[in-house]
A protein has these predicted regions:
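Chalcogenol-based redox active-site neighborhoods
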Residues: 1-170
Length: 170
């Protein structure tokens, strides 16, 4: 198991499909905060609970100026069915082919199982990873770490952040 990318690292750009006909690139969000939520699989109980929680907290993410993107190695059709079933209002990106290439670039791929790690990244407006966290695969990491990181980013913009800035949670 490799280490996920640490804060202070430039977030690797990528282009992945949201639907069979629509692709989305991280670079499209230049100048905005982005949350990347890598997860092992649509339909698994923990992943379903995690994505449903993020859907409920989505207004808080957006109020803090952040867009949420979910990423797994599932195909676009699986994502569409999962998003429809869970009534998700954020994009699920398919890291399907080459399998797990984006997860690998972020150090968030479980080679032994062929799925993404349960890993979170908060990326700042300049495309730099501000906060990253890998959760045990069977544990929903919740949203508090993401919200705290976004609040810390806002505090730094206002001159109230800590001197260390970016942080990483293993």
């Amino acid at each position: 198991m490799s280490d996920i990318l640490a804060p202070g690292t430039r977030a690797p750009d990528f282009t992945l499909h949201v639907t069979p006909d629509q692709a989305l690139s991280l670079s499209e969000f230049a100048g905005r905060r982005v949350i990347l939520a890598f997860y092992p699989a649509d339909w698994s109980p923990v992943c379903g609970d995690q994505m449903t929680l993020y859907n409920q907290v989505l207004p808080e993410f957006r109020r803090r100026g952040a867009e949420l993107l979910g990423l797994s190695v599932d195909g676009v059709w699986c994502h569409q069915a999962f998003a429809r079933d869970r009534k998700l209002h954020f994009a699920l990106l398919s890291d399907f082919e080459p399998k797990g290439a984006v997860a690998k670039a972020y150090g968030a791929y479980r080679q032994s199982e062929g799925v993404a790690e349960r890993a979170l990244f908060v990326i700042d407006e300049q495309g730099i990873i501000f906060w990253s966290y890998r959760s045990p695969v069977a544990i929903n990491p919740g949203a508090d770490g993401i919200l705290d990181a976004l609040d810390e980013m806002s505090g730094q913009e206002n001159g109230h952040g800590n001197a260390e800035g970016a942080r990483h949670v293993a």
